[in-house]
Amino acid sequence: MVIYAHDYGVLPNEEVAVQLENLLAAVAEIKDEKKIIFDEGDYYIESAKLQSRMLYITNTVGDAEFKNGETPHKNRCALAFCGIENAEFDFCGAEFYINGKATNVAVIDCKNLLIENLKLTPKNPNIRKMTVIAKSLFSVDFKIDGDYYVKNNALYFKGIDYDYNASGQYRFATHLAHIKAKSPKQVWRTGKLFKSAMGVSEIKPGVIRIKYPRTAFCAVGDRFYAFDCLRQYAGIFLDKSENITLQNVHQHFNYSLAYVAQDCKDLTLKSCRFAPKTEDFEIASLADFMQVCMCRGHIDVENNYFDGACDDCANFHGIHFIIESISGNKLTVAFKHPQTHGFNPISEGDEIGYISTKSLLEKGRATVLSSKLTDEYHIELEVNDTSAAAEGFAIEDITKIPTVLFKNNLAKHIITRGLLITVRNKAVVESNRFESCSMSGVLLSDDAANWFESGFCGDVLIKNNVFEFCGEVPVLIKPENKVNEGPVHKNIKIIGNTFNYKGNPVSIKCAENTVVENNK
């Protein structure tokens, strides 16, 4: 069955928020296989016309980060694929310009979906490029690329859905990325550019001057990217969906995580481009490019281009829930990181492991008989065995662990790490180029005290990759255990990689059966 978007009023060169919503709702009612075809061209979406939804998205925003009067987790989605099965969406190169803050794409309760040949371009987002054009001992002149104004010695950024004091203590404060003129391929997370500012004034339209007690932190030609760090809206969000493929999708900007999946199965991201629309802008994602949390099946990430992230390129992990109480065969477990809560990814029939938070080693297993989210932060589980459980231990859902293939990808302008991997199933990192990461290229972590991202690695191959620049050791094996009761990670092969790094390119802690060979 073939469906044409223009038959539902989704037409190029027009505002199509409501028409898109109607089209996607109609497609959800059709259970047979279908192909939806869009006309090539430019489409426009106004955020004010989008339907609001309550979305609890892992690793994004916690209740405490919202201001008084705001509704936590209230979210708008430009393209909301909800309850759709057996569908291929061919956007034929169509570009959607989103005016105002929104999650670009949401895929919720979907199955067997292909989304291809799509371009996503938020207009005038709340990030500003500030280029140093002159400096003295006590002041720096910046060229600003977007809308702003100066009021009472403070710098404000303004646009649809935002108007805030960027130079003041707004929420947790404005975040910054710093690209130095002498090393344009590298991006660094810097301190608050405005922390020591002694005043802001406008020299002429598009140019401001900030006074400082000293100006050694920058040079003429340096670029700073300043933005509000609230992770309220995502780029592409997938929840409780299965067999979802994104192919040839270009996403030019997103307000937090570019691609975030939770409680999904069998995901593919191929030949996609997450990067700025033009070369004169260098940031595309205000947080990680990818977060894959408590998914299962196979995660396939191949032939993609990632450029300009204000956090990691990709992170594959589970969640360490902390056991707060035990009553018979019932456990009350809690989300402990303030930016991850409000959803229940643990299902009846899942196998869980009881994990010592000190050693990060598994002490026993059980099967989930029932699972209920009792509030935003707690899940009540009935299990078949609590003999290895203890209050203060963590649990990891062993069923919700995928195999991972990350192959033939390019990662550049990454402000922290290239990859974080904490999955016990097979993970292959092969033939990628990590052009610039200000921290490690690949980190095998595991923690139950900070981000609570589980778990141990059981079979990892890191092969034929090029680590062109890493600000820290390129391959770092570092579980965050507090005591040593034995190796946490195992079966790791680091073979045939090229490291451009002064110092030891591999660091290993608490791992067994690790092979490092034929690297250069």
Residue ranges and their predicted role:
Residues 24-30, 45-88, 97-116, 124-138, ...:
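Extracellular beta-strand-rich solenoid/capping regions of secreted or surface-exposed proteins
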Residues 190-283, 288-292, 299-305, 310, ...:
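Alpha-solenoid helical-repeat scaffolds
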Residues 5-37:
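Acidic Gly/Asp/Thr-rich repetitive segments characteristic of extracellular carbohydrate-active
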Residues 47-48, 98-104, 124-128, 233-235, ...:
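Short glycine/acidic-rich loop motifs that flank beta-strands on beta-rich extracellular proteins
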Residues 34, 41, 77, 85-87, ...:
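The right-handed parallel beta-helix/beta-solenoid scaffold, focusing on the short coil/turn
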Residues 185-231, 362-404, 412:
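Small/polar beta-strand repeat architecture
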Residues 98, 122-123, 145-201, 341-376:
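Ser/Thr/Gly-rich low-complexity blocks that favor extended beta-strand/coil architectures
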